[in-house]
Structure formats: C-alpha cells, structure tokens
A protein has these predicted regions:
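Beta-strand/loop substructures that line and gate deep hydrophobic ligand-binding cavities in soluble
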Residues: 94-141
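Hydrophobic ligand-binding cavity/cleft-lining segments
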Residues: 1-60
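Short beta-strand segments that buttress and anchor functional surface loops
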Residues: 67-68, 90-97
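Hydrophobic pocket/interface hotspot
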Residues: 24-29, 81, 118-120, 149
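Secreted/surface-exposed cysteine- and glycine-rich disulfide frameworks
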Residues: 57-75
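A short, structured loop/turn motif at beta-sheet edges
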Residues: 19-23, 83-87, 108-117
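Small-residue-enriched segments and motifs
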Residues: 79-80, 106
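Short coil-to-beta-strand transition motifs
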Residues: 72-78, 99-101
Length: 151
C-alpha cells in the first residue's frame, strides 16, 4: 500500500497480482455495488450508507441501473461513475456526505495470459481540518489488508 499526497489530495494506492485474465477482473469490479455488494466488509458499506442517509445523503438505497454494466453517469450506491475505459478502468466519484471530495478507482492490466495487476486507488480532497480528521479517523477501516478482497 502507498499513502501519499499530491496537490492537497490524499492518495491511497494498493496493487496486487490476481490469477485471472484482465477481462475477468474488470468484469468483477464493474459489477460492484447494488445487489452484488462489495468485495469485503459489506457491513462497513451498510453502516456508511446508513450514516449518509441520516446526514441527508443518498445512502445505499439507489443501488445501480444494471447489475452487469456501467456507463459514465450511472449511480452505484452512493457513488457516481465518472470514467470507464472498457477492459481497463472504472472511476467512481463519491456522492455521500463528506468533509471533502472522494474518488475510488479500479485499474487492471495484463501481467501475462492468466495473471493481472489490479490497482485500487482512493483519492480524498479534504475540506479543511474536518476533512483531515475524517480521513485519519476512518483510516484504520481503509487500511484493511487487500488480501481480504475476494478476487
């Protein structure tokens, strides 16, 4: 895991090799959210969705338009699809109530015929001291070992 900042944005980047072709890995991360849920800690996503609803946000109730396909502009729970590069990249922008702005990006590239390199990057642009406190307060949850991912 790499934790860094760039121009006031906190970046948390994780990479791992996955024993699956890139197309299969891309298919998995493009089906996240909605009825499918998330790859680990669904309880934490549910709690975050509940808190978001209490704060007047959209929560997790939106689900998603299609369980298998994403397009730019689609809602995925409390995220909005900001970028899609078929077979390669999915970037989600947070629409939940936050003291800042956040994005979650999944990127995959072939390492060889049967192995892929998966990169997950969380971006957070904190708004003031409350944004920094939010990031570091919830960092232990974000720091869950990526081997818990069910790839």
């Amino acid at each position: 895991m790499v934790l860094a900042t760039h121009e006031g944005i906190i970046l948390e980047r994780r990479q791992r090799l996955v024993r699956s072709p890139a197309a299969a890995v891309y298919g998995v991360f493009c089906r996240l959210g909605g009825e499918t849920g998330w790859l680990c800690m669904n309880w934490a996503w549910a709690v975050r969705g509940f808190v978001d609803r209490v704060l007047g946000g959209v929560g997790l109730r939106r689900g998603r338009r299609d369980p298998h396909e994403v397009r730019v502009g689609d809602a995925v729970d409390f995220w909005r699809v900001e970028a899609v590069e078929p077979g390669r990249l999915l970037r989600l922008r947070a629409e939940m109530k936050l003291p800042g702005r956040a994005w979650l990006e999944f990127r995959v590239e072939s390492a060889d015929a049967d192995t892929s390199r998966l990169t997950q990057t969380a971006f957070f642009a904190p708004r003031g001291l409350s944004g920094l406190l939010y990031w570091y307060l919830f960092y232990p949850i974000h720091a869950v070992n990526p081997t818990a991912w069910r790839w």
